[in-house]
């Protein structure tokens, strides 16, 4: 039996508001609405995001949804290099989209990024190194900053090398990245 097609988009089943198309805002709304359980600091970050969408302009803040989407979409061009997901495209989870999108989507009125640093705390084996490697590669080649420099720092060289090694493997798995990034001893340029 053929399904009827409606010329207008369906209403949001949760009410009259149209569901946000931006994954950053959708995640923030889900947290604030209690659809996703989160800690106090995550809830506050999501509340801040939603409030700043309304009144951020008065404080000199601009939401650049296209920049957020560009950063999030970049990760789809990367591949996992180890573990059960090896070889699969890197699809960001909602919380990861919120982090990456917030970092690159929020700008000051002078169009410079609002956030220069981020503190992300998650349990072991939850993809911190992969997320950081992808973010580093984005900053290196896709953020549009001429002559960008990206550093991997940690308390030990071995720890810093984990993120570098992950980025290196991501480059090796992508012919598009290989054409833009050259590996030298302990460097990706």
For each predicted feature, which ranges?
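Phosphate/NTP-binding elements of NTP-utilizing enzymes
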Residues: 2-189
């Amino acid at each position: 039996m053929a399904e009827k097609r409606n010329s207008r988009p369906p209403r949001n089943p949760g009410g009259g508001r149209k569901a946000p198309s931006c994954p950053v805002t959708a995640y923030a709304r889900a947290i604030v609405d209690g659809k996703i359980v989160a800690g106090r600091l995550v809830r506050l970050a999501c509340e801040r995001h939603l409030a700043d969408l309304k009144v951020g302009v008065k404080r000199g803040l601009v939401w650049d949804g296209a920049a957020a989407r560009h950063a999030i979409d970049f990760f789809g061009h990367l591949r996992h290099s180890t573990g059960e997901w090896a070889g699969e495209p890197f699809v960001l989870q909602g919380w990861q989209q919120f982090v990456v999108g917030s970092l690159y989507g929020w700008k000051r009125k002078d169009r410079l990024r609002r956030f220069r640093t981020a503190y992300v705390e998650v349990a072991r084996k939850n993809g911190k190194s992969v997320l950081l490697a992808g973010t580093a590669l984005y900053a290196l080649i896709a953020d549009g900053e001429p002559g960008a420099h990206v550093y991997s720092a940690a308390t030990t060289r071995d720890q810093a090398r984990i993120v570098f090694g992950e980025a290196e493997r991501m480059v090796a798995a992508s012919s598009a990245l290989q054409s833009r990034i050259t590996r030298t001893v302990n460097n990706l340029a």
